[in-house]
Structure formats: C-alpha cells, structure tokens
C-alpha cells in the first residue's frame, strides 16, 4: 500500500491524465487483491502437496522447498525464511556444500530485501566465498552490492561498518571480471 501511495504521489509531477490512469490501475489491482492472494495460496498448496508424495528424495525435497521459497519470497517473509531454513537442513544432510551456499545466499538476499541488514551481514560473513562456484560468486557479488547499496540508502545509524560507495562499484566490476559475454549464467 505504501508503495502505491508513493507511486501515486510521484506521478503528480507529470501529466495529470497519466496520473489518473495510474490511479485507476492501482484501484483495479486492489479490487482483485483477494483473487491474487487466493491464486498464490493455491499454487503454494500444490507445491506443498508434492512434499507429501511417496518416494520423494531429500534432493527432490530441497528443490520443492526452493519452489516454495520462490512463491513465498514476495508474499510472506516468515514462510520464505522457514523454507530456506528447511532447505539448509536438507543441504547439510546430503552434505552438499554447493546447495548450502545457494541457500545461504538466498537467506542473505531475503534478509537484505526485507531490511534485516544485521542478520544479512551475519549470513554473508558465514559464506566461504573461496569455495563458491562461478555462478554463486556472481550471485554473492550481486547480493553483496545490493546489501551495501540498500544499507547505505535506508539506514541512518551505522551499527555495521559499511565501506564507501566505491565498494559497490568494485563488486559490480568484479562480476564483469569473472564473467564473459558468451557465458550463460544460471
């Protein structure tokens, strides 16, 4: 709701008819909000039912929880965090460092996006960047620069030592250094 209001206020600087069109679209979206929530909950229920299927391996469970995380992430922080915690337990059970790293990166990004910067910083500190795959390094640099940007942007009191803005640029440059134009990233 707050974002809608902010958007509406920012639109007042431009054309009045464009502003009215945006307000109409926002009103229409709000009218259908319950439908959107119901559709999201149905999709989540379908994915959750896959967890109860016979013969689901731990690796399959990990990937099902990944699907749940993707659905919950923009929808419910607590549920998204819970699915990541379950993924991490499974990744540890099957002794997959790679899956553990992926999950930890998702946790750091989730906490950053939600504004839990202290928690995100602690999670980043737990990740052994030397053992990340190339795709994971790209994700780490991207997540870390987003963390630094958001932290500098939204936090007025500094309880985390944040490097200057040039560190964000260094992370972006590092992504360009370790990737090539013809290399697909997952």
PLM region descriptions:
Residues 1-10:
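Bacterial N-terminal signal peptides
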Residues 11-186:
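A "functional boundary" signal
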């Amino acid at each position: 709701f707050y974002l809608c209001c902010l958007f509406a206020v920012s639109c007042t600087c431009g054309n009045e008819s464009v502003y009215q069109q945006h307000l109409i679209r926002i009103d229409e979206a709000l009218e259908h909000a319950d439908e959107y929530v119901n559709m999201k909950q149905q999709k989540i229920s379908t994915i959750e039912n896959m967890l109860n299927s016979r013969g689901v391996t731990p690796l399959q469970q990990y990937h099902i929880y990944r699907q749940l995380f993707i659905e919950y992430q923009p929808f419910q922080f607590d549920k998204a965090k819970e699915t990541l915690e379950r993924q991490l337990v499974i990744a540890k059970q099957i002794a997959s460092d790679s899956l553990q790293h992926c999950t930890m990166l998702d946790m750091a990004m989730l906490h950053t996006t939600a504004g839990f910067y202290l928690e995100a910083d602690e999670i980043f500190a737990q990740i052994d960047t030397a053992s990340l795959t190339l795709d994971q390094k790209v994700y780490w640099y991207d997540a870390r620069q987003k963390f630094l940007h958001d932290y500098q942007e939204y936090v007025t009191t500094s309880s985390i030592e944040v490097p200057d803005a040039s560190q964000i640029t260094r992370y972006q440059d590092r992504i360009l250094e370790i990737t090539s134009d013809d290399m697909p990233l997952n």
